[in-house]
Regions:
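Helix-loop "lid/cap" segments that line or gate small-molecule binding pockets
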Residues: 27-33, 56-72, 172
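Short, acidic loop-to-helix structural element flanking the phosphoryl-transfer center
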Residues: 3, 8, 88-130, 134-144, ...
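Hydrophobic alpha-helical core bundles mediating ligand binding, dimerization, or RNAP-core interactions
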Residues: 22-26, 30, 63, 138-143
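Non-catalytic pre-domain segments flanking phosphatase-related domains
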Residues: 1-9, 68-80
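Substrate-recognition "cap/lid" segment bordering the active-site pocket of phosphatases
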Residues: 129, 134-185
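Generic non-transmembrane alpha-helical segments
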Residues: 25-33, 85, 89, 101
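Active-site neighborhood of HAD-like aspartate-dependent phosphohydrolases
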Residues: 1-45, 51, 57
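Alpha-helix termini
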Residues: 67-73, 118-119, 174-184
Length: 185
């Protein structure tokens, strides 16, 4: 098939509403370590700085800024502690377990697109895929379980450097288009 175009989607905030999952897990994670629960505006303001795409790092940064702003002597938690707390809130258990065992905030997510969108794109010779900072189990859950997509083209956490680095987008575009992008060597 000769493609007429290519669309690479983010997942969070584009394919699924994560305000009652990732964002809620961020709020509750921060609260569990410093007793302060940031607002959605606090979270958005930090995300808008452009470097806090990873919610674990975002949570840690919110804790650090709060404790500094309030002159607290609280020692920030280790990143591993943030990951463990966040994961328990978000998944409700281990993310590698079967989806049916998940009981966390991930169950609150609503789909923002019509399930037929991707077949419509394919029918119109438009290639598509996903580039997300989400963990692989979370990304696959929404794409395969909620949207019923079979092996969707996906670059997720750990597959490429974190956004805003464009490497994940470039790699997936090259794979889908089957040619190298960029300037000639």
């Amino acid at each position: 098939m000769k493609a007429k175009g290519l669309i690479l989607f983010d997942i969070d905030g584009v394919i699924r509403d994560c305000s009652k999952s990732y964002m809620l897990a961020t709020k509750k994670t921060v609260y569990s370590f410093c007793g302060w629960e940031p607002s959605y505006v606090d979270i958005d303001n930090l995300k808008n700085e452009g470097i806090w795409n990873n919610d674990w790092d975002l949570s840690l940064e919110l804790i650090k800024r709060f404790t500094k702003e309030h002159n607290l002597s609280t020692v920030p938690p280790l990143r591993e502690e943030i990951i463990k707390c966040f994961g328990k809130l978000y998944f409700g258990c281990c993310p590698s377990e079967d989806y049916s065992k998940w009981s966390g905030f991930i169950k609150n997510e609503k789909i923002l697109v019509n399930k037929d969108l991707f077949q419509t794109l394919t029918n119109n010779q438009i290639l598509w895929g996903f580039v997300s900072g989400a963990e692989v189990p979370s990304a696959k859950y929404v794409l395969e379980n909620k949207l019923n997509l079979k092996n969707p083209p996906l670059i997720a956490m750990g597959d490429a450097p974190d956004k805003p680095n464009p490497e994940g987008f470039i790699n997936l575009a090259q794979k889908l288009l089957n040619y190298k992008l960029g300037a000639k060597s």
